[in-house]
Amino acid sequence: MRTSEIAKRFLDYFEQHDHLVVPSASLISPNPTTLFTIAGMVPFIPYLMGEQTPPKHRMASNQKCVRTLDIDEVGKTTRHGTFFQMLGNFSFGDYFKEEAIHYAYELLTTPQDKGGYGFDPEKLWMTTFTDDEEARSMWKNEGVDPEHIQIMGMEDNFWTTGGPGPGGPCSEIYVDRGPKYGVEGGPIADENRYIEIWDLVFENYEVDNVKSKTDLHIVGELENKNIDTGAGLERLAYLMQGKQNIYETDEVFPVIEAAQKLSGRTYGDDEAMDVRFRIVADHVRSALMIMSDGVRPSNNGRGYVLRRLLRRTVKAMRELGVTEPVMPTLLPTSKAAMEPSYPELNDTFHDVSEAAYGEEDAFRRTLESGTEIFDMAVTKAKQGGSDLVSGEDAFKLHDTYGFPIEITLEMAADQGVKVDEAKFRELMAEQKSRARADALKKRHNVDLSVYDDFKKTLLQPIDFLGYTDMSARAKVLGIMQEGKGSVPAVTGPANIEVILDRTPFYAQAGGQLADQGEILSDDGAVLEVDDVQKPIKDLIVHQCRLTEGTLVVGAEVNANIDLERRGAIARSHTATHMVHKALREELGPQATQRGSEDAPNRLRFDFQWSSAPSKDAMNAVEARVNEKLRENLAVTTQEMKFDDAIALGAMHLFGEKYGDIVRVVSIGEDGWSRELCGGTHIDHVGKIGAINIMSEASIGSGVRRVDAVVGQGAYEFNAREHALVSQLSDMVNARPDELAERVNMLLAKLKESDRRLAAMYESQLAASVPTLVAEAKASSAPVKVAKKNVGHFGSFDALRKTVLDVRGQLGEDAPVVVALAGMNEDGKPMVAVATNEAARKQGIKAGDLVRGASKVLGGGGGGKPDFAQGGGADATKIDEALEALAGQALKG
């Protein structure tokens, strides 16, 4: 029975028993403290805790889950996996223990031809909580052999949330796999032979003061008792399919089969290699499912977990002997295996695959550059009589070559050495400390504690008025200078930081740049406000230039923002929301915000997307925004509960912390765009005028950036573009509507000229072959060196072809080195070197020769022993480089 059919039977059974079947929730956990959905009951926690009313009091689901705490153990055993599916039935104040036990037993033991799972009742064992005589009696009533009902304590068979809330005893169902898997005696005796497949939790107590599983306080019984069960789908699958473990099931093993074909190895021949096969099978599936829920590789949070899964896959395949890209084979294989259960995988697969392929390409380059350095670090340690790779070397691998410490640790373990992790962590901490110090210096401060100390003196929070007021009367609460605590007074000219009791100035946040303006005191002090920041939560600090007079603490002032700048930034910020919405309409819901900057007349928007959107797609985004501008949609703001905002469909940033009450900015009466946002906006989008997308490019793995001009910036761009078109039309003697055709014609002519020039260079190279061969053969030196400065050579392929041609004609009668150097189309010097087998037997390697020659040219290079290439910056030293190379070759 296929895994998808096992899941379907579970859901069909409980639907027939009046349960509402709900689809799996996203793997992205709604809880900001948890990266992923880690258990089947997670989406139902608000119902179990009594915080929300469920749509029905009986529910069932097949929930996708990811746990990566044991990622290092994956593959080493056949029981660990990062992605799994949890079947569950739930009751919220409806049925309780007796029905839950009956449902589970009936589904498990009903024959398969009658819709059940067909487990032999004699193979089933149950564990129950010490004090739960009621559950034991109910199992007996179902016909379970009393000898198969075992008793366990609080540690194993009592469930809590880990804090105050519901709790209760549980009963676990096990399957006996037979004597070849271990000793008899039930789950208490051997959990390798007896495999847990289903856990029934009976929540009937209110628990308080949970210190540990064995140290908790039961307050009393719950008014509404709940049922929370979880059956591991993968475990059910391998037992029902007659397999040995989860890796041999129909949803996982196809990836192992694909890895076998790529590697030429056979799963089961070698345990060390089997570990790699299992890592690949598990991680590819996990990565596929995580990416399908919108996560993309990054350096933090969920994105980093995903990145690690993909990188461990590539590394494991390399250890299986595969150096070419593997994701284009493995990912579609996993998708085909999982699609019967998740047909929606097809909807996002194009973007998912692009992200995975791009991540693999980047990591393969990292592996190629870092592996050699790692090997050198291991050699250095062993030559020093140590089995410890230094923390300095591990840090260099991480900092210079982008080699993740996890990969370094795994490779070290594979080679039987360790890594000085303590020193590595120390160096990482020092680097972070330097980065924080640099950031503080950029804010003209050395220590945030001065702000913390000042904030403690405030009697009430600072009042931000900037949503409605552009100027305000205020009182000076504090003056800071040179990163020191508040001073009573400062006389200008001076650079100072000013804290007011109330302010219309917007502090930089959420991508929106700060307001600028002026502060004028009643006693004559004049301050130009250049920037406004929140160095710590809820403290608004105005960074000012005191140009006239003396400012004293307690002074009454007028605070006036620059209205023109505020308006320009507000237009950009509203336009950013519109670009975000239009991108999601054009590309799909995975195009989510990763960052932004809203400045006067321009915006920058970073979004999650793995591949370059087409030019047509970006044109459509621009056109869509301008269409909405012409509709002059209203912009409204409203404060509401976070859950209510999400229910309305408001966009928010995953990983961002929000309060219970949030501010929602909506564009259009029907909420065409709706986002959680604390920034400033215009009241109607028509005031933006126009937007032009200037560029779209990658700024990192899986992250793209849009730069656009807005309002006056867009008008100025259009004027410049019109002038440029007129100028180009005059230059090529064509009307504006003929410009593209005329430029294409000129480019075609240029391409033909380049082709002829390349053919000439290639002909010249070919003509030099007979002379090079003859001169080398005539040489009496122990190593035949054929070298030449060919001048301009056109394409490097032609140079490489000539080098290999000369080597082939010189044969294997004597050691041969062929070295040609010249200038590419950019005038940069390059060198190509080939050696024959006779030379390599004497230790003469092309890579070594190229490195020496490239050093003379002021550059670098490398390659394999039989062929290598390099280059530099100083073309005047080509002859010198060739002479140095020849001398090195003759020394052997």
Swiss-Prot record:
Its cofactor is Zn(2+). It is an enzyme of class 6 (ligase). InterPro entries: aa-tRNA-synth_II/BPL/LPL (IPR045864), Ala-tRNA-lgiase_IIc (IPR002318), Ala-tRNA-ligase_IIc_anticod-bd (IPR018162), Ala-tRNA-synth_IIc_core (IPR018165), Ala-tRNA-synth_IIc_N (IPR018164), Ala-tRNA_ligase (IPR050058), Ala_tRNA_ligase_euk/bac (IPR023033), DHHA1_dom (IPR003156). It catalyses: tRNA(Ala) + L-alanine + ATP = L-alanyl-tRNA(Ala) + AMP + diphosphate. The keyword Nucleotide-binding applies. GO terms for cellular component: cytosol. GO terms for biological process: alanyl-tRNA aminoacylation. Keywords: Aminoacyl-tRNA synthetase, ATP-binding, Cytoplasm, Ligase, Metal-binding, Nucleotide-binding, Protein biosynthesis, RNA-binding, tRNA-binding, Zinc. Its EC number is 6.1.1.7. Binds 1 zinc ion per subunit. It is found in: Cytoplasm. The keyword GTP-binding does not apply. Zn(2+) binds at H573, H577, C677, H681. Gene3D superfamilies: 2.40.30.130, 3.10.310.40, 3.30.54.20, Bira Bifunctional Protein, Domain 2, Threonyl-trna Synthetase, Chain A, domain 2. HAMAP family: Ala_tRNA_synth_B. Belongs to the class-II aminoacyl-tRNA synthetase family. Catalyzes the attachment of alanine to tRNA(Ala) in a two-step reaction: alanine is first activated by ATP to form Ala-AMP and then transferred to the acceptor end of tRNA(Ala). Also edits incorrectly charged Ser-tRNA(Ala) and Gly-tRNA(Ala) via its editing domain. Consists of three domains; the N-terminal catalytic domain, the editing domain and the C-terminal C-Ala domain. The editing domain removes incorrectly charged amino acids, while the C-Ala domain, along with tRNA(Ala), serves as a bridge to cooperatively bring together the editing and aminoacylation centers thus stimulating deacylation of misacylated tRNAs. This is Alanine--tRNA ligase. It comes from Bifidobacterium adolescentis (strain ATCC 15703 / DSM 20083 / NCTC 11814 / E194a). The lineage of its organism: Bacteria, Bacillati, Actinomycetota, Actinomycetes, Bifidobacteriales.
